[in-house]
Amino acid sequence: MVTIVLNKYKLLNKIGIGQQKLEDLLFNLKSEIKPVDESNIEIEINADRLDLLSSDGIARAIKGLLEKELGEAKYDITDTEYKLIVDNVRTRPYALAAVIYNAKIDLQELIQFQEKLHSTIGRKRKKVAIGIHDLKKIDSKRIEYREVPLSYKFIPLYEKEELTISEVLEKTEQGKLYGNISISNGVSPAIVQEDGEVLSIPPIINSDKTKLDESTKDLFIDVTGTSFEAVAQTLDIIVSNLAEAGGTIGRVKVIKTDNSFQQSSPLLIHKIQNVREEYANKILGIKISEEEICKHITRMRMNCNVENGIIRVTVPQYRVDIINEIDIVEDIAMSIGYNNLEPSKYISTNYGSYDYLTLLERKMRELSIGAGFVEVFNFVLIKNEKILDSKYVKILNPISEEYNAVRNSLIPILLDFLSKNQHAKFPIRIFETGDVVIYDSSTDTGFRNDKRAAYAIMDNKVSYEDVQAPIHYILKTLGIEVNYKEENNDIFIEGRSASIVYENEKIGVIGEINPDVLIRFGIEYPTVIAELYITEIAKKLNKR
């Protein structure tokens, strides 16, 4: 959910209803109201409804439910002489722009709208950043988006003196928060006038030159980012909501310097989504006609018509949450009102139960405890430096470097556990069962989940046989007669390791840990480990 704060009286006046009616209609739109003070309300909005993140977007939607306005909202659009020349900006290659004329602007609400878009579709400005400028303070109709050196100077928003971009990164709060997103190789993306004067350094900060004030009515809006689709959608939403406030949308000619793109912006992208009458009725559990379906769709501010028995919905540019047929059906439910839909009873002829893999894992845990091992629980994520195999899943944006990869074996994580518990009373006998993600070229992703169990013993003196005996007992109790086939593995001492084989298939490994591996983990005592592949064992046993 996304939370916005709006002036209650301004919103009610825009729609022409009372607060209770507003609460009821917002509930239909999956939103809730909480009072903040006498004048302001807090509204929780579903994160996919970006068009509702301002009072104008909310008013547009509710006017549809009230049938004051039906179908897609129509806005005044005009061509302008403004051009945005887009150069090769390596860290944020995509940019679009638009002009808004004569909009009724609430500065506080506009800034909130901008920041909520930054935090949602913009992924905290990493994916999309928005610059909003007072159009009358821009001196040229040719605007450029290009890279500039960090020595480039301009006056940042709310500052009095010129700073270099390097100084902005060091001295301003915005620079500290967002400077690492787009700076690379000593250059930064920049929106500049034809004479080179900076208008903004996306995604960090605007220039003070084009600062908005209470007299601002005309806007120049730039949107930059790493995804063209997200950039286009963001700009479409902004200009649509500002046009709802009475503004006229001005098109800007966007031209790539390599001539790979030349188009008027905003794109105002519409799409056609077909809906089947029988599908909608089945999902909703009701019986309504094609005409009734179309009526509800127009109440949700989309156009609808029926052609040869097919319901065609024109999805406007501000409804980026509509992806496929089920989203249209959800909108029909909102128009009808969830309170007006009767919940159907779920009747099942089956009953739930654990699958065989889960039952086998539970049985192995019981047997492992009975064999004298203590169960430990570790995270599925691990530091990649601790992984002993080169084929693993690495996380591109980890919260911590300690958890930047997904484990592909339980052996490293048990060794890591032992390294931190060498002070404990010997012998240390531990085991863990859990998921790993292993390389598999036959899958769509190249990896698959696997369930495993691993056993480790650390003592002043310990050998292969100390772990083989309990493993053999556990497997035999499960009705599994295995063979041990010598196998050399860098993890283990040469000649002191084996693969565990059942019905000619490898179901595990066992051995004495190589001293080099022990040194790598900071372990000072001999250690033996076995790992069993529960998923493979389950496949074998389940066929019996």
From Swiss-Prot:
Chief location category: cytoplasm
Family: Belongs to the phenylalanyl-tRNA synthetase beta subunit family. Type 2 subfamily.
EC number per UniProt: 6.1.1.20
Recorded GO CC terms: phenylalanine-tRNA ligase complex
Binding residues for Mg(2+): D321, D327, E330, D331
Cofactor(s) needed for function: Mg(2+)
Gene from which this protein is expressed: pheT
PROSITE patterns documented for this protein: B5
Name of the protein in its database record: Phenylalanine--tRNA ligase beta subunit
Keyword set, alphabetical order: Aminoacyl-tRNA synthetase, ATP-binding, Cytoplasm, Ligase, Magnesium, Metal-binding, Nucleotide-binding, Protein biosynthesis
HAMAP family: Phe_tRNA_synth_beta2
Reactions performed catalytically: tRNA(Phe) + L-phenylalanine + ATP = L-phenylalanyl-tRNA(Phe) + AMP + diphosphate + H(+)
EC main group: ligase
